Amino acid sequence: MIKVGIVGGTGYTGVELLRLLAQHPQARVEVITSRSEAGVKVVDMYPNLRGHYDDLQFSVPDTQRLGACDVVFFATPHGVAHALAGELLDAGTRVIDLSADFRLADAEEWARWYGQPHGAPALLEEAVYGLPEVNREKIRQARLIAVPGCYPTATQLGLIPLLEAGLADASRLIADCKSGVSGAGRGAKVGSLFCEAGESMMAYAVKGHRHLPEISQGLRRASGGEVGLTFVPHLTPMIRGIHATLYAHVADRSVDLQALFEKRYANEPFVDVMPAGSHPETRSVRGANVCRIAVHRPQGGDLVVVLSVIDNLVKGASGQALQNMNILFGLDERLGLSHAALLP
C-alpha cells in the first residue's frame, strides 16, 4: 500500500485528490495538512467524503510525518513546494507538485511571471514535467514531478501531433481557451461570486497569462524550435471544464489529420480522439481523467482547428497527478481513474 501525504488539502484540487484516492486500491492517505484548518476533520469540511476518511484530520505541516510517506502531493499556491520539497526528497519521499513551482525549466523566467525569486532553483534540473503522453519514461524514474496546468494540458495535447509531425507553422499558433470558475480556486474573490460569473463570459490576462510560458515551453519541445503562440483565456459560467479551440496553419492538404491524431494517441488510455466532424463538450469529461479531441480542416483550407476538452480539476490537475503516481510506482496507469464522466 502506497502511503500518501497531501500538503494543502482544503482547496478544490486537494479535495479532488481525496475523492480520487478514496477509490484507489493501492493507496492510503496518511497525512493531510492545512495550517488554517488544523484539527478539523476532513469529513466535517467535505461531507461527500464521509465513509472514506472519517478519522482523518487536517494538521499543521510536519516534515517528519510527511517524510514517512512514500509520496507527497502539493496542492498549494505557488511558492510552498519550494520550501519543503528538498527536505522531503532527502528523506526518500517522492514529490508530486500540482502547483506551478517546478513546471518551468528556467528559474529566471519563473521569477518574471510569478513576481518572486524561485525558491529552489537547484531542483529544477531534476524536476520532470508530468505530461504522461510526452514524458512517461522520465516519470517512471522521477523523484520530483511537476503536474502540468489545466490550460497547458488541453492546449499541448491538442497541438502536439501537428508539431511533432512538422506540419504546422509553429510561428502562428492560437489557443482560444475557456475555463470553469473552479479554475480560479476556492478562495473568496469578487470575480468568482455567482452574481459576477453567472450568465456572463469574459476574456482575461490577454496581455500575458502565467500559463503562457508553460505552454510555449511544451510546444517548443514538440516542434524542436521556437514557437509563436497567442493564448487568450476566458472565464465561463460553469463550475468545471476547459474548452480549448486551437488554430494552426497546415499548408499540406494531402495529410490525413484524423489518422495522424488517431495514430499519435492510439495507446494513450486518457486521450480520446473523437470521430471526424465531432465537437467535444466539456460535460463529456466532467469528473473524468480524459482529454477528448476533435480535429477539423474547415472548407479544406490551410487553417486547422483542433478542439480539446478536459475537466480542469481532473485531467487538468488531480487526476493527472494520480496518473503520474501510478506510473511512478509501476502500477496500471488507469488504476483509480477508469470511472466514466458524470452526466447530466
Curated annotation (Swiss-Prot):
One of its GO terms (molecular function) is N-acetyl-gamma-glutamyl-phosphate reductase activity. Its EC number is 1.2.1.38. It catalyses: N-acetyl-L-glutamate 5-semialdehyde + phosphate + NADP(+) = N-acetyl-L-glutamyl 5-phosphate + NADPH + H(+). Disulfide bonds: none annotated. Pathway: Amino-acid biosynthesis; L-arginine biosynthesis; N(2)-acetyl-L-ornithine from L-glutamate: step 3/4. Pfam families: Semialdhyde_dh (PF01118), Semialdhyde_dhC_1 (PF22698). Keywords: Amino-acid biosynthesis, Arginine biosynthesis, Cytoplasm, NADP, Oxidoreductase. The active site is at C150. One of its GO terms (biological process) is L-arginine biosynthetic process. GO terms for cellular component: cytoplasm. Its main location: cytoplasm. SMART domains: Semialdhyde_dh. It is found in: Cytoplasm. It is an enzyme of class 1 (oxidoreductase). Catalyzes the NADPH-dependent reduction of N-acetyl-5-glutamyl phosphate to yield N-acetyl-L-glutamate 5-semialdehyde. NCBIfam families: argC. PANTHER family: N-ACETYL-GAMMA-GLUTAMYL-PHOSPHATE REDUCTASE, CHLOROPLASTIC-RELATED, N-ACETYL-GAMMA-GLUTAMYL-PHOSPHATE REDUCTASE, CHLOROPLASTIC-RELATED-RELATED. Belongs to the NAGSA dehydrogenase family. Type 1 subfamily. This is N-acetyl-gamma-glutamyl-phosphate reductase. It comes from Pseudomonas paraeruginosa (strain DSM 24068 / PA7).
